[in-house]
Regions:
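Short, glycine-/aromatic-enriched active-site segment of Class I SAM-dependent methyltransferases
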Residues: 198-214
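A short glycine-rich, Lys/Arg-flanked "PGG" loop and its adjoining helix->strand segment in the class I
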Residues: 175-187
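Rossmann-like AdoMet
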Residues: 1-133, 137-150, 258
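Short alpha-helix
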Residues: 216-239
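A short SAM/SAH-binding and catalytic strip from SAM-dependent methyltransferases
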Residues: 135-136, 145-175
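Short "lid" loop at the C-terminus of a central beta-strand within the Rossmann-like core
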Residues: 164-167, 196-200
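Core SAM-dependent methyltransferase catalytic element
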Residues: 238, 243-268
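Conserved beta-strand signature within the Rossmann-like core of class I S-adenosyl-L-methionine
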Residues: 157-161, 184-195
Length: 268
């Protein structure tokens, strides 16, 4: 099957759970299949806080993008692992502050691609684009036509890696991937990263979530998450439990969310 622009549309494998569709299920969306729901329910049975975690991750996105656009003057965003469109997507938050903001979304689920083309529409002053790619191949993202046509890599870019790097296992070089992406961006660019952790989980829960059938490739501790920001200048409050990052209200307990988050700037 071909899309309107002539690209061949990849096939959706509904028998295998996909993180973007499972995330949609936890958020109460309808763009998911039986395999996604089965996997999502299995994880929720062991870790009931998962729905709180995904809601808090979306709230973090809003806070971080607002901070970067309003306080750091960022006008370009590269959002990798964007997931299915929902309320307060990156471009919507950024363009409320700066209508001229430009955003490139990246994901590797064909269903996300279909919805992104239809729903992730920019303001008249700005621009959005979508890249069908995997974070594990950063050069494919950086050298894509969409990035070249949408972003000026001579000007600061916010790299958004929300709830994605825990799907990259140690043998897939997660730190090298992030370093490759960050070093391709100019000084003044920022990294926004959230990451699941087992720091507050019983060992059996962590083992199930990290299993090949259901989960994250690697839950990492705080020091391991902080390592993604090596060489960057952390913005206050640093690497903290996700819901506590510049929280606007009393956050849920760290153990209920079981994620860390941080925002950092590439120095001049």
């Amino acid at each position: 099957m071909q899309s309107e622009d002539g690209d061949v549309a990849p096939t959706i494998d509904v028998s295998v759970p996909h993180p973007a569709r499972r995330y949609d299920y936890w958020l109460g969306g309808k763009d998911n299949f039986a395999a996604d729901r089965e996997s999502g329910d299995a994880i929720a049975a062991q870790f009931p806080g998962i729905r709180t975690a995904v809601v808090e991750n979306r709230r973090l996105l809003r806070r971080a993008v607002t901070q970067l656009a309003a306080e750091q003057g960022i006008r370009q965003f590269l959002d990798i692992g964007t997931g299915l469109p929902t309320a307060s997507n990156t471009h919507e938050v950024a363009q409320l502050i700066a209508p001229e903001a430009r955003i490139v979304y990246v994901d590797n689920d064909p269903l996300v691609l279909t919805h992104a083309r239809a729903l992730l529409t920019s303001s008249a002053e700005g621009r959005t684009a979508y890249v069908d790619a995997d974070v594990r191949d950063p050069d494919n993202i950086l050298h894509s036509r969409e990035v070249a046509d949408t972003l000026d890599l001579n000007q600061p870019v916010a790299l958004m890696l929300l709830a994605v790097m825990h799907f990259v296992t140690d043998d897939e070089d997660p730190y090298g991937i992030v370093k490759r992406l960050v070093t391709a961006l100019p000084p003044g660019s920022c990294l926004v990263l959230s990451h699941a952790t087992a720091d507050w989980m019983p060992p059996e829960t962590a083992a199930m979530i990290q299993s090949g059938k259901h989960g994250a490739g690697r839950l990492r501790g705080r020091d391991e998450v902080a390592r993604f920001f090596d060489g960057l200048e952390l913005i206050e409050p640093g690497v903290v439990p996700l819901a506590e990052w510049r929280s606007e209200a009393t956050p849920p307990p760290a153990a209920e969310v079981a994620m860390y988050a941080g925002v950092a700037r590439r120095p001049s």
